[in-house]
UniProtKB/Swiss-Prot annotation:
Name of this protein: 2,3,4,5-tetrahydropyridine-2,6-dicarboxylate N-succinyltransferase
Residues involved in substrate binding: R107, D144
Keyword vocabulary terms for this entry: Acyltransferase, Amino-acid biosynthesis, Cytoplasm, Diaminopimelate biosynthesis, Lysine biosynthesis, Repeat, Transferase
Keyword Amino-acid biosynthesis included in the entry's annotation: yes
Coiled-coil segments on the chain, per record: none
Quaternary assembly: Homotrimer.
Taxonomic lineage: Bacteria, Pseudomonadati, Pseudomonadota, Alphaproteobacteria, Rhodobacterales
MF terms in GO: 2,3,4,5-tetrahydropyridine-2,6-dicarboxylate N-succinyltransferase activity; nucleotidyltransferase activity
Signal peptide bounds: none
Any single biological process term in GO: diaminopimelate biosynthetic process
NCBIfam families to which the protein is assigned, alphabetical: dapD, PRK11830.1
Keyword presence, ATP-binding: no
The species this protein was found in: Cereibacter sphaeroides (strain ATCC 17023 / DSM 158 / JCM 6121 / CCUG 31486 / LMG 2827 / NBRC 12203 / NCIMB 8253 / ATH 2.4.1.)
Annotated pathway: Amino-acid biosynthesis; L-lysine biosynthesis via DAP pathway; LL-2,6-diaminopimelate from (S)-tetrahydrodipicolinate (succinylase route): step 1/3
GO cellular component, one term: cytoplasm
């Protein structure tokens, strides 16, 4: 099926979503499964960059949600001391052997979790972390320990997601567009970027920076206040601004533009990606 045909089938299925069950067969099941497979392989993305803008394939996001209706809950094995889990989404690595790992070309440290329909590109390093459905993690990126990449999130090339970083998903609460971290960004430990916000190329977020759609992003040099997007090449730290009643409220502060000193402190280590 072409992508245009898949889109039409998914949109029709979405309108009739209450009728979809694990017993559903035919074009509806085939379209949902084909879309999830394309997302899993990286040939389709929930969002793709066109020039300077990001285009969201809303139908692909709908397919991720519809996938939940196609399977019943089941026991999933592999836990410590023969423990199990209870879920309806397969691991991306289910049934993988040496050949599949070599073909995929990324490293997955024990106890990392990647759910089916997420794409992991070559050269990625996954420490014990979590990558949810429909996400896209591009080449050379490090997803460090306890970092989470939310549903349908888009992570660019050569990004470093430090320990405990949270990149928000789109499924609950429902978001119009995915959270996006563009190429060559460094996201400091325990930072959170959520609600479909965009961190533009080459930016650095310091430790403990939290950005949602309502977070004020303040340029210290110009005083400009923006929302939802960090400009390319920004260095951002946590800060505060005066509010009513003499109370200061949290904000994110652009303290400078990325320079050689910043790059030397946040460069990726190629030795880890061999």
């Amino acid at each position: 099926m072409s992508y245009s045909a898949l889109e039409a089938a998914i949109e029709a299925a979405w309108e009739a979503r209450e009728t979809i069950t694990p017993a559903t067969k035919g074009e509806t099941r085939e379209a949902i499964e084909a879309t999830l497979e394309a997302l899993d392989k990286g040939s389709l993305r929930v969002a793709e960059k066109r020039g300077a803008d990001w285009h969201v394939n809303q139908w692909a996001k709908k397919a991720v949600l519809l996938g939940f209706r196609l399977k019943d809950m089941e026991v999933q094995t592999g836990g410590p001391q023969a423990g199990t889990w209870w879920d309806k989404v397969d691991s991306k690595f289910a049934q993988w052997g040496e050949a599949q790992w070599k073909a995929a070309g990324f490293r997955a440290v024990p106890n990392c979790v990647v759910r089916r329909s997420a794409y992991i590109a070559r050269g990625v390093v996954l420490m014990p972390s979590f990558v949810n459905l429909g996400a896209y993690v591009d080449e050379g990126t490090m997803v460090d320990t306890w970092a989470t990449v939310g549903s349908c999130a888009q992570i660019g090339k050569n990004v470093h997601l430090s320990g405990g970083v949270g990149i928000g998903g789109v499924l609950e609460p429902m978001q119009a567009g995915p959270t996006i971290i563009e190429d060559n960004c460094f996201i400091g430990a325990r930072s959170e970027v959520v609600e479909g916000c965009i961190v533009r190329e080459g930016s650095v977020l310091g430790m403990g920076v939290f950005i949602g759609k309502s977070t004020k992003i303040v340029d210290r040099e110009t005083g400009e206040v923006m929302y939802g997007e960090v400009p390319a090449g920004s260095v951002v730290v946590a800060g505060s601004m005066p509010s009513k009643g003499g109370v200061n409220l949290y904000c994110a502060v652009i303290v400078k533009r990325v320079d050689a000193q910043t790059r030397s402190k946040t460069s990726i280590n190629e030795l880890l990606r061999d």
